[in-house]
A protein has these predicted regions:
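Active-site-adjacent bridging/hinge elements
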Residues: 206-212, 239-243, 319-324
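N-terminal low-structure segments adjacent to metalloprotease catalytic domains
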Residues: 2-152, 392
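Post-HEXXH active-site segment of zinc metalloproteases
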Residues: 68, 224, 239-263
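Post-HExxH zinc-binding segment in Zn-dependent metallohydrolases
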Residues: 253-296, 348
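Conserved alpha-helical "signature site"
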Residues: 281-392
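Short alpha-helix carrying the canonical HExxH Zn2+-binding catalytic motif
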Residues: 223-239
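Short, glycine/acidic-rich hinge or "gate" loops at secondary-structure transitions
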Residues: 138-142, 247-249, 282-283
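Contiguous, non-catalytic segments that form substrate-binding/exosite surfaces or channel walls
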Residues: 101-221
Length: 392
C-alpha cells in the first residue's frame, strides 16, 4: 500500500511539474535572477523614501495654531505655513526611481509582475515631482481628485455618526509599558515575528515600520484603545506586511499600488468587527477625512476649519485645526487649495465590508489593492510556479 501511495505522490508531483513548466507565468532562470536583484533594489529605494517622507510631523504646529486662532479672534484670516523636517525634494531618490523604471521595463515582456512594480514606482516618483514643483513655485493643483459623489456619501455618514468628544483622562489609564506587553502577547498569538519598542519624541501614539512596532513613551491608552490597536495595527497593517514577506518579494511586503485602500479598509473593518468594544468616532473619523479631502480643493483653509467646527461642535479647536492640517502637510503652505487626499479609509472600508471572509483573507495574505482585484488568481499562479522563498 505504501508503494502505491508513493507512486501516486510521485505522479502528482510530476503532473504539477508539467503544468508549471507550461505556465505562461513561469520565469526563465535568468529573468528570475534579474527580478530578485531588482526587487532588492526596489526594497532599498523604498526604504530610503519611507525613512525620509513617512510619518512626517509638523514641527511648528502649536505656534501656527496660536497665530491662526489669534487672527480668527480679530476677524482676520491666517493661512498656516508648516515646517516639516525632510520634506524637500530628494534628487537622488527621484533619479533612483527613474533608473529602476528603466530596469523593470527591460524585463516587462518576460515577467508578468514587472508591471506592478512600475505602477508603484511611477506613483511614488510622481509624489517627488510634486515636491519639486512646490519647491520651485510651479505647482498647480489641477482638478479635484475626489468626486462629489464620494463627498456626498461621506457627508451622509458624518450626519449618521456624529462626533462624540472622548473623556481621555477618565479612560486612558494604561501606560506605554502596559501596552508593550499586550502588543507582544498579540504578536506571539498570531505568530508574527515583529519587535515592539518604546520611543520618545513620536507624534502618533503607535505606528509600524518594517519589522518594528513603535509605541510613544508619553502616551496613555484605554482598554478599548489597546483592543482597537491590536485589531487595526497588528491584525491589519502588521499582518499584511508579514504575509507579504512570505511571498518572497518585497513588492508584496510593501503592497501593490492602490493596496493602501484595502490596507486601511481592512484595518477599519477589523476595528469594528474584531473587538468587543469598538472605539467611538471610527465612522465619523473616516468619513470626515473624505469630506475634508474634497473640500480642501473647494474652499480655503480658514473656511474649512469653520465648516468642520459646525459638523463637530464638541471637537476642540486644536483637534479641528490638526484635522484640517493633516492633508495639507504635502503643500506646507495652507493657502494652496489642495493637499494629499485621505479617502482611503472611507473608500477602503466600504469595499472591504462587502467582501466575503475568503476575499478578506486573500487581501491580508497578498497585499493587493482594488487595481489588482481581478488579477489575484494570476498573481497566485505566478508565485506558485516560480517558487519564491519567504523574505527574512
Amino acid at each position: 500500500m505504501g508503494f502505491i501511495n508513493n507512486n501516486m505522490n510521485n505522479l502528482l508531483d510530476f503532473n504539477n511539474y508539467i503544468l508549471e513548466s507550461k505556465s505562461i507565468y513561469l520565469l526563465d532562470p535568468s529573468t528570475k535572477v534579474t527580478l530578485l536583484k531588482l526587487d532588492e533594489k526596489y526594497h532599498k529605494l523604498i526604504e530610503k523614501f519611507r525613512t525620509k517622507y513617512s510619518a512626517q510631523t509638523v514641527e511648528n504646529i502649536r505656534e501656527e495654531y496660536k497665530k491662526f486662532m489669534a487672527a480668527k479672534e480679530n476677524g482676520q484670516k491666517y493661512f498656516p505655513k508648516l515646517e516639516i523636517k525632510n520634506s524637500d525634494f530628494d534628487k537622488n531618490i527621484y533619479e533612483g526611481f527613474g533608473k529602476l523604471i528603466d530596469e523593470f521595463e527591460d524585463i516587462e515582456d518576460k515577467c508578468y509582475i514587472a508591471k506592478f512594480y512600475l505602477e508603484k514606482i511611477h506613483a511614488m516618483r510622481a509624489r517627488l515631482e510634486r515636491l519639486k514643483q512646490l519647491d520651485e513655485g510651479t505647482y498647480e493643483p489641477g482638478d479635484n481628485p475626489v468626486s462629489k459623489e464620494l463627498y456626498q456619501q461621506a457627508l451622509q455618514c458624518v450626519k449618521e455618526h456624529p462626533y462624540k468628544r472622548p473623556d481621555y483622562e477618565k479612560d486612558r489609564t494604561n501606560e506605554s509599558d502596559d501596552v508593550l506587553e499586550k502588543i507582544e502577547d498579540a504578536l506571539d498569538d498570531l505568530g508574527y515575528d515583529f519587535d515592539v519598542k518604546i520611543f520618545s519624541g513620536m507624534l502618533p501614539r503607535m505606528n509600524v515600520k518594517m519589522d518594528l512596532v513603535r509605541i510613544n513613551k508619553t502616551s496613555k491608552f484605554s482598554d478599548e484603545d489597546i483592543e482597537g490597536l491590536i485589531a487595526h495595527e497588528i491584525k491589519g497593517h502588521v499582518g499584511r506586511f508579514f504575509y507579504g514577506k512570505k511571498t518572497g518579494l518585497w513588492l508584496f511586503a510593501y503592497g501593490l499600488h492602490s493596496a493602501l485602500d484595502y490596507d486601511e479598509g481592512l484595518a477599519v473593518w477589523n476595528s469594528l468587527n474584531l473587538v468587543e468594544h469598538p472605539k467611538p468616532n471610527i465612522m465619523f473619523n473616516i468619513s470626515i477625512k473624505t469630506c475634508i479631502s474634497y473640500l480642501m480643493y473647494e474652499m480655503d483653509f480658514c473656511d474649512l476649519f469653520d465648516w468642520l467646527k459646525k459638523q463637530a461642535p464638541d471637537m476642540s479647536d486644536f483637534a479641528a485645526f490638526k484635522t484640517c492640517i493633516r492633508p495639507r502637510r504635502v503643500n506646507k503652505d495652507c493657502e494652496i487649495l489642495s493637499g494629499g487626499p485621505m479617502t482611503m479609509y472611507f473608500k477602503g472600508y466600504n469595499m472591504v465590508k462587502e467582501m466575503d471572509d475568503q476575499m478578506r483573507d486573500d487581501i491580508l495574505h497578498y497585499n493587493i489593492g482594488p487595481n489588482q482585484k481581478y488579477e489575484l488568481e494570476n498573481i497566485k499562479e505566478f508565485l506558485k510556479v516560480n517558487h519564491f522563498k519567504p523574505l527574512k
